[in-house]
Amino acid sequence: PIELPARPYQTYVSVSIKAKGKGTLFIGAIHKRWSRLELGQFILGGKRYSDENKQEFIHYFHPGDLKPPLNVYFSGYRTAEGFEGYFMMKRMNAPFILIADPRIEGGAFYLGSENYEQAIRKVIQNALDYLGFANNQLILSGLSMGSFGALYYATKLNPAAVIVGKPLINLGTIANNMKLVRPNDFGTSLDILRLNQNDITNKDVVQLDNHFWKQIQHSDLSMTTFAIAYMEHDDYDKYAFQDLLPVLTKQHARVISKRIPGRHNDDSATVTHWFINFYHLIMEERFGRVTHARR
């Protein structure tokens, strides 16, 4: 990275690229980010991972009071690069990890190469090992795009609970819905389809959808509690909850749900309220932690 010192006045930054010779030049995205120099990425203690294809995610670990559970929050779609949910997670006092995906425009749903996905699991497992926790002392959570990260990595980590709001699961269908269901809205979904499948045909839509379902159908989530707040008229992934419930029921997972009227981007305040309520409920019931909000 190129470090530009802060200035007391407004200015512009321009980038020029010069190339000479024969071959193919690939130019990726240019990112402008706050620097903490050697003290962290974005915030003090923040870290960045990049795989062999320069696909990256960022993560931050806070040890809290060193008592279970370890709460992991996957950031939702956001064009402003950085961490999401810091103060919300910190108020719970428990150890937590923030994970964010700054790829494409707003995030690529935490899917990637084998090394990329293994690195996300390793970040979580290393924190569990540091704290001396087992996987049944882990909660994965996220809203919207972050819900996919929580649900997807739950199939690999077998946490105590998964807490999600506005779940998005069928990523191929989300891209396909841009034709008629929500024209010109969330074009990033097409980029995600092409990133993972190299094309945007109907076959690619089905294959990307099936990527998640193959994972969850070959996992054991019988000891995991799922708390899900979903939109009744979701125009991104309308049947996400209806598709997920039979699979979780078959695995004898415990499911707590709240249906909220509206489309995907409606009534975020109510969804967030239920998301936090689910956290308080599970932390008290499973771990004996009574938060200030429930006293």
Kindly give the residue locations of the regions a language model identified:
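Alpha/beta-hydrolase fold nucleophile elbow
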Residues: 132-146
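Hydrolases whose catalytic domains are alpha/beta-hydrolase-1, hotdog thioesterase
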Residues: 149-153
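Beta-strand-enriched, solvent-exposed domains that form extended recognition/catalytic surfaces
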Residues: 1-45
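Structural alpha-beta junctions
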Residues: 9, 91-97, 134, 246-259
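The feature captures the conserved acid-bearing segment of alpha/beta-hydrolase catalytic domains
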Residues: 181-258, 264-294
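Hydrolase active-site cap/lid region
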Residues: 155-197
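Short, surface-exposed "cap/lid" segments of acyl-processing enzymes
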Residues: 45-94, 98-105, 228
